[in-house]
Amino acid sequence: MKPFPRAEISRYALQSNLAQLRLIAPNSKIMAVVKANGYGHGLLNVAECVGLLNYVESVCKYHGGADGFGLARLEEALQLREGGVKGKLLLLEGFFRQSDLPTLVSHNIDTVVHHESQLQMLETIALDKPVTVWIKIDTGMHRIGFSLEQFNSIYQRLLACPQVAKPIHLMTHFACADEPDNPLTQTQMNAFEQQVSGLEGDRTLANSAGTLFWPTSQADWVRPGIALYGVSPVVGDRGVNHRLIPAMELVSNLIAVREHKAGDSVGYGASWTAKKDTRLGVVAIGYGDGYPRNAPEGTPVWINGRRVPIVGRVSMDMLTVDLGADAQDNVGDSVQLWGKALAVEEVAEHIGTIAYELVTKLTPRVVVELLD
């Protein structure tokens, strides 16, 4: 028997999703965003499946592998280099310390520059060769990036800095692209174009939502994150609506099946009481594995071809489901918490969160297994 709980990662789904994103953005290069351990799918798993690993070069060419990878931390980028990735890597938050800069140079890692402190570090260091920079413009997200008023002076300082490779690349990030009717995205696109018109360098604006819903934002590069994993970035939408395939199936097993009498409660706090005689199943997964404790009663799981509801509170190692009075389920039967049969987007909606949070919060107790 395979270990459980486990996250089964589909190589085919990842490669199919990349191919579909190429059809959606045919004139753009793809920077696959693999931060947070490949959105919980395993950093090197994703890298192997969608391109750039030296030992799967022929496979990546056949499938049209990603043109680069976007990451949040230098440690993630170094893990990819150590794993054999040779292509473009970009630190989406940039570097945090001046001492990081020689490492960026020696490992050929691009960096975002979004703050005055980073520029000062570049201006006061001597490097063996210049570092490739993407200047981030704050067009409306108001999180990181140079304001529209700052941009010209910052850009000129970067041009004058010998530690910065030329041309300088240009980027912004959307605040509301996952709301297809929100006019802010078009406002951000207009502001970005006004700032960068006539400048050299590659441009990137589109995250997953931009790529799927705002085709005029696709530019030189798109940066799909959650879409690469077969999940829609838009609440109420599903990845399958865009011909994307869920890449993760979170599965476990039934470890107990119990007769349960009407009027009996179950679990901590006795928060659920059976209205009629039924059979309960106990599933070996809980908040210690990253399944949310706040999943309400009625959140579905998938067992033997049907949905059954969670009842009672999710505990650290287990959760309980109402199998029904006539259930024929047995100890050892497989349980899918989300995946192809039960969209992670739907589970997230039941819990009151987003799919991003579910897939990235799995703990090390969950075995991540790459399948063909």
UniProtKB/Swiss-Prot annotation:
A Pfam match is Ala_racemase_N
**Which residues are recorded with the post-translational modification N6-(pyridoxal phosphate)lysine?**
K35
Assigned protein family: Belongs to the alanine racemase family.
Q: Which organism is it from?
A: Shewanella frigidimarina (strain NCIMB 400)
Q: Which UniProt keywords apply?
A: Isomerase, Pyridoxal phosphate
Q: Name one GO molecular function term.
A: pyridoxal phosphate binding
Q: What Gene Ontology cellular component terms go with this record?
A: cytosol
Catalytically driven reaction(s): L-alanine = D-alanine
The annotated pathway is: Amino-acid biosynthesis; D-alanine biosynthesis; D-alanine from L-alanine: step 1/1
Active-site residues are K35, Y268
Q: Which SMART domains match?
A: Ala_racemase_C (SM01005)
The free-text function statement in the UniProt record for this protein reads: Catalyzes the interconversion of L-alanine and D-alanine. May also act on other amino acids.
Q: Say if the entry is tagged with keyword Transcription regulation.
A: no
The biological processes this protein is annotated with in GO are: D-alanine biosynthetic process
What Enzyme Commission number(s) does the record list for this chain? 5.1.1.1
Protein name stated in the entry: Alanine racemase
Query: Per the entry, which co-factors are needed?
Result: pyridoxal 5'-phosphate
Binding residues for substrate: R143, M316
> What PANTHER family does UniProt report for this protein, alphabetically?
ALANINE RACEMASE, ALANINE RACEMASE, BIOSYNTHETIC
